[in-house]
Amino acid sequence: IIAASGGHNVLLIGPPGSGKTMLAKRLPTILPPLTLEESVEATRIHSVSGELQPGMALLARRPVRSPHHSASTPALVGGGSIPQAGEVSLAHYGVLFLDEFPEFTRSSLEALRQPLEDARVTIARAHATVSFPASFTLVAAMNPCPCGYYTDPRRPCKCTPLQIDKYLSRISGPLLDRIDIHIEVPGVPFSALRSQTDGTPSSAMREQVLAARDRQRHRFDGNPI
């Protein structure tokens, strides 16, 4: 709810089966709807990129992009001889979900720093420089170690301290600094998940997010924030 209310980037760290992917996929369901201005701008990007579905005039929902960790740097942030928008721009005003975060190439991860800082991507070529908007909420998920079970009480970890350090070092400090919220997601037995019946529905969470954003608009009314 905090991430959705403030547009904060999130890093989820936990063993396999802890629900990281499920949490990430539920975030878009509690985000407020696109405004008309946001919808027009996001639709333009999808249209010029050939991503707009036939017969769709405007995007009705916030875009959610989840590229595979094998995606190249140009595919992620944009590029090519004729510059094209990448996943970060296709996620404009929406969510960019990066599962297996450390498995992306170092160059791809470092290329995320500019859009996370400036909400734009600049692609320089010999004949021109092109800038694409990229204001998105990053949701990244990763295991705590190569085998995935370093923090899981259900299974022993097989990794050495050196392997764990090397794995975690794939994500640089400057990139981590741009991710506002880091959450450790503990491993939970499936039986425990099934027994939970008193959870808060997405509709109720969305109302809380809408109320929080409304308070923010009133609080900063007249300020260029």
Label each residue range with its predicted role.
Residues 1-10, 124:
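Peripheral, non-AAA+ core regions of ATP-driven protein-machinery
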Residues 98-105, 148:
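Catalytic P-loop NTPase motifs of RecA-like helicase/translocase cores
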Residues 1-3, 57-63, 68-96, 129:
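Conserved alpha-helical scaffold flanking the Walker A/P-loop in AAA+ ATPase domains
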